Amino acid sequence: MTEKITLADALSNVEVLDELSLPDEQPCIEAQPCSIIYKANFDTNFEDRNGFVTGIAKYIEEATTHANLNVLLDEGQKHAVMLYTWRCCSRAIPQPKSNEQPNRVEIYEKTVEVLAPEVNKLLNFMYFQRKAIEAFSGEVKRLCHAEKRKDFVSEAYLLTLGKFINMFAVLDELKNMKSSVKNDYSTYRRAAQFLKVMSDSHTLQESQNLSMFLATQNKIRDTVKDTLEKIVGYEDLLSDVVNICVHMFETKMYLTPEEKHMLVKVMGFGLFLMDSDACNINKLDQKKKIRLDRIDRIFKNLEVVPLFGDMQIAPFNYIKRSKHFDSSKWPLSSSNAISPQADLMVHLPQIREDHVKYISELARYTNEVTTTVKENPSDAENRITADLALRGLQLLSEWTSVVTELYSWKLLHPTDHHQNKECPVEAEEYERATRYNYTSEEKFALIEVIAMIKGLQVLMARIETVLCEAIRRNIYSELQDFVQLSLREPLRKAVKNKKDLIRSIIMSVRETSADWQKGYEPTDDPVSKGKKDPDGGFRIHVPRLNVGPSSTQLYMVRTMLESLTADKSGGKRTLRKDIDGNCLMQIETFHNTSFYWSYLLNFSDTLQKCCDLSQLWYREFYLEMTMGRKVNKCMVRHQHNEECKDLITMEKRIQFPIEMSMPWILTDHILQTKEPSMMEFVLYPLDLYNDSAHYALTVFRKQFLYDEVEAEVNLCFDQFVYKLSEQIFAHYKQLAGSIFLDKRFRLECEVLGFNFQSYPRNNRYETLLKQRHVQLLGRSIDLNKLVTQRINANMHKSIELAISRFEANDITGIVELEGLLEANRICHKLLSKYLALDNFDGMVKEANHNVLAPYGRITLHVFVELNYDFLVNYCYNAATNRFIRTKVNLSSTQAIQREKPPQMSHYYLWGSKQLNAAYSTQYGQYTGFVGSPHFHAMCRLLGYQGIAVVMDIILKDIVKPLIQGSLLQFTKTLMIAMPKSCKLPRCEYGSPGVLSYYQAHLTDIVQYPDTKTELFQSFREFGNCIIFCLLIEQALSQEEVCDLLHAALFQNIFPRPFCKENEKPEAKQKRLEAQFANLQIVSNVEKIGTAKQAMIAREGDLLTRERLCCGLSIFEVILNRVKSYLDDPVWCGPPPANGIIHVDECSEFHRLWSALQFVYCIPVRGTEYTIEELFGEGLNWAGCVMIVLLGQQRRFEALDFCYHILRVQRVDGKDEDVKGIQLKRMVDRIRRFQVLNSQIFSILNKYLKGGDGEGSNVEHVRCFPPPQHPSVISSSSHYQDPQKLRQSMNN
């Protein structure tokens, strides 16, 4: 069987859903989202009045009249909407240019067809205003009848008459304002007359009437005034209407801002209607029928009120236009002092204080509701909750009024270029009223108040169900307690004293609204007979239900009770004199309290109206007033119009740009100022679009207005996301740049007084980045996703810029590139806390074009710079271990042409202009040389694959063509120029003689024209290639060692711990291993991972451990590859004649290099560049590498010409000038180069011998006999094989 679930259980299950946490839990920094919900409207407009037959018949009749007047008010609202939202049609309709135009008839027919429905609306409007004036004047006439003057008129009825006065004022001002209505009707009438559509006299007369009605200014106002002046005593009734408005305004007997402003408009227009030839309002003031001083104070505090939409009016203007206006009676309103309404900063402290107090109280109540469950709260708790809800609505209404009143005042008081220096002279009217009419402080205050309104609206809407239930229970209990209990005493006295009218009214109240427990009034109640209760009291149990009274019920109860306390009651004396004072106070208190019940019962609608700020977007009045004109250029300062003679262009448009729209002005102000305290409020001004769209659909019911709101929202939100994304990226990029900046450098800057504000202030972007579903025009927008998309693009641009910047510089830019990428990585890490950005390494690969290609832009540019600039133009110095650019360019290649990096904002580089300057200074240190920092950066950026590619290309495209090309050709040429034989002269010749000997034999080599240019340049390029490969390997080895040290802790590798005496190192080592056991990758993966994961972990661990232990050497491979290129016979020469070694012959490369070394050891004159300055040590490295690879090192060291001069000079110590060469200077140079060559040979031999086996230290010795003197050597036996000699001796 299916289990039955009670309603209580079902409801409790639904309430449990509130405990479910949303997956995103985004901070609430936006207004109430618009949801699709069912709203029940229990306002019946007195349709159920006939059901209350027990009520006083007079008030039921009044309810009938009320219902009819409300229908007229609703119809008037529709006509007001029609007029306000009217857009000029005639401007869009083509007009015939001449009477001979062939399609003139067709144009007129289409004009009539298009405009006929709109003209019918205007006719209906004219008929309506007649009907409404007749109905209003009829009611005034009825109430002003001599027999009715002393009759009681209810507060609600007087308020309805006030609403009529307000309606007439609004309709009249709208009709006056809309010139497009007159233009459209003129266009229609012209077309209709041409086509003779209006043929009958009645139609013509109505057309004429409509034309006059539209053309006459203040037609409705004057008609109402003329009609009322014919009614005797109308001023007394209007005095009551004005007085009730004054009373309600001063006692805050209103709830929505619209009602508050309506009261003020009724005061102004009502006094204007009263002031006539027959009635002087100043005399009425003297008679105390009205209080002008109180109204004057109200008019001063509220100089301007919204009229309709963006239309506004100064109520005091009605008084100024009255017949008996006396400025002395209006001292405050006539003064030039600015109204408090115009200064939002005056209201702000109190608003903040009220907001904090109320939010605290509401939060406490919300926490209490969510943490404790009470099935039936007490009456006191319900009353507190209802009061809390009412106070919240009142605060919201008050704050909304402050905003709309300020906006209205600003619209009526636009600024100009004299008051605001930022306002251009040619700024148009609406622009001066909105864009330039608010100071920065006012904008921030406006944003803050709007945020308070929208934020509180969200909080109250969240607990709407709880509040509404408490409101209904409280209203029910208070109404029933009052009717069933509090009215017993006045009823008893009325029965006892035979006050039949009072008794009948009280009985009607009880019968209308009492909800007796048994369904009927107790028959044995002593009160009904005027008797006292028994000694034990008469017990009446009042039920408690969750239901409120109907609108008609509430109206009947309040009106009948009001009749008991009113000053007018229709008789000679008022009824209140017959009621006990205590009871009278109870009735008045109940009457005042119940005024708000209709608002509370419609809590949702009231909350919406109290927070409605749609007025801040609408601009129909200004569109009509300016007709969309924008003055592009006019040389004269005046109010521009179409007749301006100096006007060059006047553009017409149907809408204002977003820069003049208040929602965007406020939103953009936050984004422009980047004020941290306001950043979390940035979504609240955008909610003004929600209000405007809601108003367009529910009140105006105009699709085109909604479309315009939607179009602006589309544009503004795109701008908002774009600007916000740029700001967030710039903020975090600046933060990353500040974090990455060298701390010592920053400290030195601060010491020197250069403060570049490196660390940006916290701007509270985190809250915005957590917004996953921003509600805008019914759309749920993932702001986080949109910002992520844009910041992803910005990250790509930033990385792209870093690489492009490197491509625009020489090889020294590699250090800055690494820094830029690291700053971007930090920025990416900071942003990744809130945004799902692409993988940073993937971004770098994509920007580097290295996703699928074996090498990327960085590798390619490194090689290009090496090939065309670095290898050919840089000189190496072993003392500093750096390359520097040569002073003279001897390269045959053209200078490299680099593209300029793209121009982008500062934040794409390092984050800000100041940081860019700081980093430019910091990385400027690395631009004058290429050294260890550059090689380390290359290793980290290129990686193994990039390094392998670069080295492979260097060998194939640079080294091999050099060796087998230019160097080979030069070697062959110079070998021919070398002497056939060049001996080592004996020491007896002395060092000057030896030098002269070599100088004479090597004349051709010394004087060879290309030796010190092309030949040495080729050797320099070759040597630089070798040095580059060596330094790259050294840097790579250091990086690998660093990786190993970093990984040691995770591989169970610990440094030997320090041990005290009598402490075993093994025990301490074990404690260390146990302490860091959780960090051991392999063991942990083997425990909790799969077999495949464990295998991968073991292989990774093995690779990390053995990477450097294998003794792998890139440089050895490089040398062996180079050795393979030295395959031409010219390098080794022909076999020696003696079968052993060339001693005096110049047929091997080392002899040529000895000659070249003799050339560059010759001292230069004072003004010439030395070989070291021109070519660096790459020249020496090239020769030494080739000598070692050819196996000629020992021969070179033994038979070198320069070394021989050095050895001889050390013995004799002579210093002479030998044919222009200072011997001592040359010997000094020889010694330096000998040391350098020894170092190079040492390095090369270390790498080349590192690859041999363990027995490589065993030398293969060949035995030769000692040399003999030529005189004892026979011609036939110049040389004997030692083996043969041994054999002959044995034989």
UniProtKB/Swiss-Prot annotation:
Pfam families found in the cross-reference section: CYRIA-B_Rac1-bd, FragX_IP
GO biological process: axon guidance; cell projection assembly; chaeta development; cortical actin cytoskeleton organization; regulation of actin filament polymerization; regulation of cell shape; regulation of synapse organization
Biased composition, class Polar residues, residue ranges: 1271-1291
GO MF term set: small GTPase binding
Region (Disordered): 1269-1291
Alphabetical list of InterPro entries matching this protein: CYRIA/CYRIB_Rac1-bd, Cytoplasmic_FMR1-int
Listed GO CC annotations: SCAR complex
Subcellular location per the Swiss-Prot or TrEMBL entry: Cytoplasm
Alphabetic keyword roster: Cell shape, Cytoplasm, Developmental protein, Differentiation, Neurogenesis
Quaternary structure annotation from Swiss-Prot or TrEMBL: Interacts with Fmr1 and Rac1. Component of the WAVE complex composed of Hem/Kette, Scar/Wave and Cyfip where it binds through its C-terminus directly to Hem.
Biological role stated in the UniProt entry: Plays a role in guidance and morphology of central and peripheral axons and in synaptic morphology. Also required for formation of cell membrane protrusions and for bristle development.
PANTHER family: CYTOPLASMIC FMR1-INTERACTING PROTEIN-RELATED
Similarity field: Belongs to the CYFIP family.
Protein name per the record: Cytoplasmic FMR1-interacting protein
Organism: Drosophila pseudoobscura pseudoobscura (Fruit fly)
